[in-house]
């Protein structure tokens, strides 16, 4: 019973980690593209667009908009950090 729930949570957590790793790889590729095309790392309009869409989708799924705001802001901040670090190394 409880063990089964915990195993299910562990499985979900592993999928989340895999998706975050994949997202960071794509973010680094975006950083390379931006550097090649002399673009700013932070594209505030894109972030706001993505965040608004995520919050709306979260609400429709019964997930707290505030929670999603914090999670996606943290993911975005890490993506920016990785883009900067990765392009500085090249």
Explain the meaning of each model-derived region:
Residues 1-90:
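Domain-level signature for soluble enzymes in the chorismate/prephenate branch of the shikimate pathway
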